[in-house]
Amino acid sequence: MRYFRPLSATAMTTVLLLAGTNVRAQPTEPTPASAHRPSISRGHYLAIAADCAACHTNGRDGQFLAGGYAISSPMGNIYSTNITPSKTHGIGNYTLEQFSKALRHGIRADGAQLYPAMPYDAYNRLTDEDVKSLYAYIMTEVKPVDAPSPKTQLPFPFSIRASLGIWKIAARIEGKPYVFDHTHNDDWNRGRYLVDELAHCGECHTPRNFLLAPNQSAYLAGADIGSWRAPNITNAPQSGIGSWSDQDLFQYLKTGKTAHARAAGPMAEAIEHSLQYLPDADISAIVTYLRSVPAKAESGQTVANFEHAGRPSSYSVANANSRRSNSTLTKTTDGAALYEAVCASCHQSDGKGSKDGYYPSLVGNTTTGQLNPNDLIASILYGVDRTTDNHEILMPAFGPDSLVQPLTDEQIATIADYVLSHFGNAQATVSADAVKQVRAGGKQVPLAKLASPGVMLLLGTGGILGAILVVAGLWWLISRRKKRSA
């Protein structure tokens, strides 16, 4: 997926006192075999399952795996690198060992640290066999592209790549081997390998701690991922996917569409570039494993997200139409009038969408049923664009660059509020400030504040004071020793 995964903290010596060690052990047992795909090599299959193209190809018109895609992070944009076998701008000169180090440990051939927008904390448990297959695929089947990708230039202190080595220790990013769990069958083990390693689902769906390392106590319980919300996919019946049928889960992962859910944002990209191409047996294995994930309930959720239906519409369409006109639409903040103007032609005045389901119902929809409204806000701001089975699903964006109807933060807030109260979870509310935050890329994480001028000044002042204290302490010790020897 194309949103930020964990990013380094600056080098903090105090953290090192609490840190563990980073040790790589080799797997002793193979993973369950994937479903048979005779039309492609195993390495090609693994590249699809690992979703390499989503980040390393710059949009639908970009050159395959040539990098250049801007991955949004709290510290700034991180540009994906060229991983074609180009010997001038790609990884064509990498040995298998160097490729493995980059993939599993985030260390380039020149020894520099890779930013963890690359999910090496998930890939570090890939088996040796799979790493070799991926290497063979990239080196022999991918077309080399002799073109550079933009350089990542993050603000200080995040521009210091060496600090990533300290972050890996402090955040306990360890290369633990994959171990086959003999208490479960092959299907479950294959599902776990796909979810935790290849598809790296936890990179988005597991929340992060202060150091932006995965908080495993809330494994797959949902997290903010840039402007979007990666939902809870534990087996919780109200907060997660516990009320979904196996068929619904299978269909959603394969197509991005069910009667009560539609994929958008990073999840739409994962389905478009990766999941839709996996064999049915592998999708079923993912469903099997997800069914075993312990439920993590969220406070305030009393029914499943798709069981909310808001309240019956209390306004007259005619009255709403009379309160707006093309000349006043840009200024109105009447939620009903705005909904009727920019939403109802597809989703209908009653919010139930088209009869054939092409335009989804907003009633009984997981996006409108969440307590966290970020996905609804982001869908309005950025639209929906996914292609599955060579069929594109498109909802226009209504953000500032909209070609259809640019809306202000306040207008988007009133539309979202109207949708939630009439068709979704009436407990959720949206403010103009919430829209502004989503538009800006989501909540600022505490570590990102290290790059602010005020914090840098404070850290700099603290460093100077610390140096003065150290010098003063040394002077005192030397003076004391001289007095004793006198």
Swiss-Prot record:
Post-translational modification: Binds 3 heme c groups covalently per subunit.
Compartmental location: Cell membrane
Keywords recorded for this protein, A-Z: Cell membrane, Heme, Iron, Membrane, Metal-binding, Repeat, Signal, Transmembrane, Transmembrane helix
Biotech relevance: This enzyme is commonly used in a number of research projects to examine the electrochemical properties of enzyme-catalyzed electrode reactions, named bioelectrocatalysis. Available as a commercial product from Sigma Aldrich (catalog number F4892).
Signal peptide stretch: 1-25
UniProt cross-references to InterPro entries, sorted A to Z: Cyt_c-like_dom, Cyt_c-like_dom_sf, Cytochrome_c-type_DH, Membr-bd_ADH_cyt_c
Binding sites annotated in the UniProt record for heme c 3: 343, 346-347
GO biological process, one term: fructose metabolic process
Membrane-crossing segments per the record: 458-478
Residues annotated to bind heme c 1: 52, 55-56
Membrane topology, record value: Single-pass type I membrane protein
Cytochrome c domain boundaries: 38-142, 186-294, 330-423
GO MF annotations, alphabetized: electron transfer activity; heme binding; iron ion binding; oxidoreductase activity, acting on CH-OH group of donors
Source organism superkingdom: Bacteria
Positions bound to heme c 2: 201, 204-205
GO cellular component, one term: plasma membrane
Quaternary structure (record): Heterotrimer composed of FdhL, FdhS and FdhC.
UniProt function note: Cytochrome subunit of fructose dehydrogenase, an enzyme that catalyzes the oxidation of D-fructose to produce 5-keto-D-fructose. In the complex, mediates both the electron transfer to ubiquinone and the anchoring of the complex to the membrane.
Official protein name in the record: Fructose dehydrogenase cytochrome subunit
Gene: fdhC
